[in-house]
């Protein structure tokens, strides 16, 4: 089949939340989450809303604030809307700090000190013509080893009785590696898989399925996010185009992903179902080489992710793999989250003579993920030129105010603006439907995620404006 070069994508990010009143007093997660969402509930009478940029902002199970981007159809657009969620939640956190008289921390990470994990879920629209089993078989080896190039890094200190206790304390490339339990499954929490198979395409189900990848880390670095998503886009296109990729089906994906996370040489032997072995570096290098060849002949799409956005992705991909060959990661020390954070922790440990389990290092690990623009350590590093950014601040600020103009999100955004201009109206919004409730109301189905216009919604808006 033909590769989808204009692909609908989205990111869902759950944030950790914490509060400090003073050195000895703090509010619990549930209470501080209620404080965080108080302005949302006051304005919209709900803690589950669609924002003016057509994304979804809500309070998830376990007191985790969550942001799901609107539908995007290009790489840089997706990164801008992912970052817009950080800005929206920072504004809410700032208001919550004023309300409670203490600091409110929102952490874009994936684990807490009690061993709980929360996710960054990637969504990619794929053709239903490709059997999910075949797609997963080719994609899993890439996803298991992808942490080499886009992990967020973590100072792992297993608690007694934890499944990863036998590994002992130490730095890992991936935050999520210790928290997945299956390769492919319909579960999301109880038996967390690498690929979730729950069939909710939010599109024509006879044509499309939504590939739901839940193994990835939340990234602070826009550059790392670009590599994470951009490399995955290329692998999906290659699978759809029928590019011959080596068979790296693993004998045990779950054991492999944990071992890879702790090996900074990329040379640990991974057992394959074929009976042979391969190293993570060898697997990533095979996908990288194939992506280079594919991109060289890829036709630039009129809409979607242009080659100009993918070329730097492939360049960085290769440079990270070269660092594993040499053992020197300084060439990417401002671009890859796990490398940036490890450099920071190593400098601090050396300067103060700290052991890996010193709580001061664990605190630095957490503060790296603080989304506060002046307090968060990643943002401090970025201002000092020690962490590279990708997008101009005004691009992200515009994404806060405006829905993506090229997808179904544009229609949802226009509807939201129209109904909120009439405060007395009751309305309902979902990914595929918008509705004005009550007598004289109207409903429109938004079945096509690629369509950025809707005559039905235009008629609803016209009727509202004529009231």
UniProtKB/Swiss-Prot annotation:
Positions contributing to Mg(2+) binding: 12, 58, 66
Pathway: Protein degradation; proteasomal Pup-dependent pathway; Protein modification; protein pupylation
Keywords: ATP-binding, Ligase, Magnesium, Metal-binding, Nucleotide-binding, Ubl conjugation pathway
Residues forming the catalytic site: 60
Keyword Nucleotide-binding belongs to the record: yes
InterPro entries assigned: Pup_ligase, Pup_ligase/deamidase
Pfam families xrefs: Pup_ligase
Residues making up the signal peptide according to the UniProt record: none
Catalysed reactions, as listed in the record: ATP + [prokaryotic ubiquitin-like protein]-L-glutamate + [protein]-L-lysine = ADP + phosphate + N(6)-([prokaryotic ubiquitin-like protein]-gamma-L-glutamyl)-[protein]-L-lysine
Top EC class of this enzyme: ligase
Gene Ontology MF annotations: ATP binding; ligase activity, forming carbon-nitrogen bonds; magnesium ion binding; ubiquitin-like protein transferase activity
Positions that bind ATP: 56, 69, 431
Transmembrane segments: none
Biological processes annotated in GO: modification-dependent protein catabolic process; proteasomal protein catabolic process; protein pupylation
Catalytic activity, EC: 6.3.1.19
Additional information: The reaction mechanism probably proceeds via the activation of Pup by phosphorylation of its C-terminal glutamate, which is then subject to nucleophilic attack by the substrate lysine, resulting in an isopeptide bond and the release of phosphate as a good leaving group.
HAMAP family found in the cross-reference section: Pup_ligase
Record-stated family: Belongs to the Pup ligase/Pup deamidase family. Pup-conjugating enzyme subfamily.
Cited function: Catalyzes the covalent attachment of the prokaryotic ubiquitin-like protein modifier Pup to the proteasomal substrate proteins, thereby targeting them for proteasomal degradation. This tagging system is termed pupylation. The ligation reaction involves the side-chain carboxylate of the C-terminal glutamate of Pup and the side-chain amino group of a substrate lysine.
Name of the featured protein: Pup--protein ligase
């Amino acid at each position: 089949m033909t590769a989808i070069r204009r692909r609908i994508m989205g990111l869902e990010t759950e944030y950790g939340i914490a509060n400090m009143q003073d050195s000895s007093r703090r509010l619990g997660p549930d209470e501080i989450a209620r404080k965080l969402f108080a302005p949302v509930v006051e304005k919209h009478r709900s803690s589950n809303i669609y924002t003016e940029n057509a994304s979804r902002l809500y309070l998830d199970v376990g007191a985790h604030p969550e942001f799901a981007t609107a539908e995007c159809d290009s790489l840089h657009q997706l990164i801008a809307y992912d970052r817009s969620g950080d800005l929206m939640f920072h504004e809410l956190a700032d208001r919550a700090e004023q309300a409670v008289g203490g600091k409110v921390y929102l952490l874009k990470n994936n684990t807490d000190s009690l061993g709980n994990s929360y996710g960054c879920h990637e969504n990619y629209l794929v053709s239903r013509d490709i059997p999910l089993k075949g797609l997963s078989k080719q994609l899993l080896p890439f996803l298991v080893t992808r942490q080499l190039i886009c992990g967020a890094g973590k100072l792992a200190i297993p608690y007694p009785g934890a499944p990863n206790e036998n590994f002992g304390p130490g730095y890992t490339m991936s935050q999520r590696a210790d928290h997945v339990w299956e390769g492919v499954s319909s579960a999301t929490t109880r038996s967390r898989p690498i690929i979730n198979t729950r069939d909710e395409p939010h599109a024509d189900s006879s044509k499309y399925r939504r590939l739901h990848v839940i193994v990835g880390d939340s990234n602070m670095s826009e550059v790392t996010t670009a590599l994470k998503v951009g490399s995955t886009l290329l692998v999906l296109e290659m699978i759809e185009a029928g590019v011959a990729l080596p068979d790296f089906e693993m004998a045990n994906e779950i054991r492999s992903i944990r071992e890879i996370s702790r090996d900074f040489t990329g040379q640990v032997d991974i057992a394959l179902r074929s009976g042979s072995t391969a190293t993570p570096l060898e697997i990533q290098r095979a996908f990288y080489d194939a992506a280079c060849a594919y991109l060289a002949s890829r036709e630039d799409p009129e809409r979607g992710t242009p080659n100009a956005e993918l070329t730097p992705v492939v360049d960085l991909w290769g440079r990270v793999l070269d660092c594993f060959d040499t053992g020197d990661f300084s060439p990417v020390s401002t671009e890859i989250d796990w490398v940036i954070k490890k450099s920071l922790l190593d400098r601090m440990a050396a300067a103060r003579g700290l052991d890996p389990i010193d709580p001061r290092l664990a605190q630095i690990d957490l503060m790296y993920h603080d989304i506060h623009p002046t307090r968060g350590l990643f943002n401090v590093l970025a201002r000092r030129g020690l962490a590279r950014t990708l997008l101009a601040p005004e691009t992200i600020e515009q994404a806060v105010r405006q829905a993506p103009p090229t997808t179904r999100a544009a229609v949802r955004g226009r509807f939201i603006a129209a109904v909120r201009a009439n405060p007395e109206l009751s309305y309902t919004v979902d990914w595929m439907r918008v509705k004005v409730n009550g007598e004289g109301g109207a409903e429109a189905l938004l079945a096509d995620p690629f369509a950025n216009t809707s005559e039905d919604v235009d008629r609803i808006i016209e009727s509202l404006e004529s009231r």
